[in-house]
Amino acid sequence: MEEFRRSYNRLCEESGAEPQEAVLQQLHQLPKGGLDLTTQSLTVETCRALGKLLHKETLLKELVLSDCMLSEEGSTLLFQGLCANTSVQHLDLKGNNLRATGAEALGKLLRQNKSIQSLTLEWNNLGTWEDAFATFCGGLAANSALRQLDLRNNQISHKGAEELALALKGNTTLQQLDLRWNNIGLLGGRALVNCLPSNRTLWKLDLAGNNIPGDILRAVEQAMDHNQDRLTAFRENQARTKILSKEVQHLQEEKSKQFLDLMETIDKQREEMARDSRASAVRVGQLQEALNERQSIINALKAKLQMTEAALALSEQKVRDLGELLVAGDQERQSLSQRHEKERKLERQEAADRESKLLRDLSAASEKNLLLRSQVDELERKARSQQEQLFLTKQELTNTSAELKIRAIQAEERLDVEKRRAKQNMEDLEKLHSKEVDHMTRHLEESERAMQERVQRLEALRLSLEEELSRMKAAVLSERGQAEEELIKARNQARLEEQHRLAHLEEKIRLLAQARDEAQGTCVQQKQMVAESQARVSQLNLQMEGQQRRLEELQQELINKDQEKVAEVARVRVELQEQMGRMQADLVAQEALREKVAALERQMKVIGSEHREALLDRESENASLREKLRLKEAEISRIRDEEAQRASFLQNAVLAYVQGSPLRALSPPK
């Protein structure tokens, strides 16, 4: 406030006037936020300086200028400074004898100032000049900040009340109006009553001491009560609305916090899922490689086992054939020995007879001996040819086994090619899956910018990712199944080809064995071959048992790996289900918040509808009261007209009586 005082001194010096000591003293004792110049006679220069100071002053809240006897020029200068002021809220101009110029300046002040809320104009003469007061009322109608107006003792007539009523129809902020001790009268009271239905903010109107009938005062009181009830309801509704808005804002903040927490949780879960998926992919790749290695080992062992089984079956068939040959040779030898014994007996019996014939038959026997020798030579040649044919058959069998091995190796190579192709397909599918995951991630980042649809889009994205993952898994499984089916088909085809070739070879061996039966000289060799075959069969049985044990161990390891893989998949599935459960719980909490907000909105709508119904009831009640008031006013006007007619009749009668009385003739002239 010291700055305010220095500015006042400077402005007075610039204008060439002496600062008023009383004003300086008040400025020195100036309380915080207020300036009280009550009963101080302010000069025009002081008013000019104060007007310039008030034009820029931002700390002054209250200005009291009561009983200062302001001149018209001084009041105009003060009001011009207050027009641009934005801090003064209470202005007291009591007892300043403001007239036409002051009323017009006040009208301009009310039209331009947006901060004054309380204006005291008691004991002035604003209503004496109707045009100036009309200007004041126009400023009041345009004002949107004034809450309290005191116009007591301002000589306001019924015309001024009519102008004031027009101003009240356009004003939407004035709440208290004091019009006591004026000259409003019946017509002014009616004008004010008629304007009250259009004004719903004025809840206090004092009209005492204005010669207004009691019914009009009661109507004014009813209107004020109605506005006060409306104001109370409005304040209650505003308080409820503020509480509800705070609650809604709090809920929105909580919702936003929860949503941010949910988004952070989802990001963390997404990162964890990405890490888990990468680790799972690495683990699956390692397991797949190990499985492929084990599968290749198993396939090699299976191929060896099949070859061993084929060799074993061939050896067993050879053993059976050789056994049959031995049995047939033994039977033939026994039959030959029996027949030889019979022949010897016959020869002994016929020895005597032969002795005589030997000499005769010697020449014939020698010839027969030569013939038999030639037959023996022929049989030996046949045996050698059979041995050569057997050697060729063995060589063909060796070539066939080598060809079978080559075909098995080719089948294994084709199997490896199919595995590599399946692995390449898996890698391509993983790359495609990673690209699709990147695309969906970018799509998720774009969709996160929309606050209202963020949860729904996130849910849809999660579902689509799960569906895509399930589809990719199904595709991988189907391709793996197809690869396994192709592998099985290739194995079956190779096995069928081997079986056909083995059957063909067995047929050849059977034919060769039947041809070999005719050779008697190979029995010892066949026995040796049987012994060797039995020893080889025992060795092959031992090797087969070892291979079976190895195969069982590999199968057990494969089962353990499958169990570990299933356990890992189950653990990942449980984690995903837990994450989905937490997300569903968050969604349920958000849905509860939405329901709570919807309930609050419904409650606000119910309160608004009740308020509207109450307003409609009050308006209907006001309409009925206005109708009753109109009827009462009509009746009162009729009674007043009758009373006026009676009074005029009585006055005429009295005048006629006075004019016709003898006392008038005796009265001296004036």
Swiss-Prot record:
For whether the record's keyword set contains Ribosomal protein, the answer is: no
Q: Which Pfam families match?
A: LRR_6
Which cellular component appears as one GO term in the record? Answer: plasma membrane
Among its keywords, does the record have RNA-binding? no
Spell out the coiled coil positions from the record. Answer: 235-645
User: Which keywords does UniProt give here?
Assistant: Coiled coil, Cytoplasm, Cytoskeleton, Leucine-rich repeat, Phosphoprotein, Repeat
Instruction: Please give the InterPro entries that the UniProt record associates with this protein.
Output: Centro_Cilium_Assembly, Leu-rich_rpt, LRR_dom_sf
State where it is primarily located: cytoplasm
The UniProt PTM text for this protein says: Phosphorylated by NEK2 during misosis, phosphorylation reduces centrosomal localization which subsequently leads to centrosome separation.
The segments carrying the LRR repeats are: 59-79, 87-108, 115-136, 145-166, 173-194, 201-223
Subcellular location per UniProt equals: Cytoplasm, Cytoskeleton, Microtubule organizing center, Centrosome
Chain spans, region Disordered: 332-352
User: Where is the PTM Phosphoserine found along the chain?
Assistant: S661
What PANTHER family has UniProt attached to this entry? Answer: LEUCINE-RICH REPEAT-CONTAINING PROTEIN 45, NY-REN-58 ANTIGEN
Tell me, in a sentence or two, what this protein's role is.
Component of the proteinaceous fiber-like linker between two centrioles, required for centrosome cohesion.
Question: What does the subunit section of this Swiss-Prot or TrEMBL entry state?
Answer: Homomer. Interacts with CROCC/rootletin and CEP250. Interacts with CEP44.
Q: What is this protein called?
A: Leucine-rich repeat-containing protein 45
Gene source species: Mus musculus (Mouse)
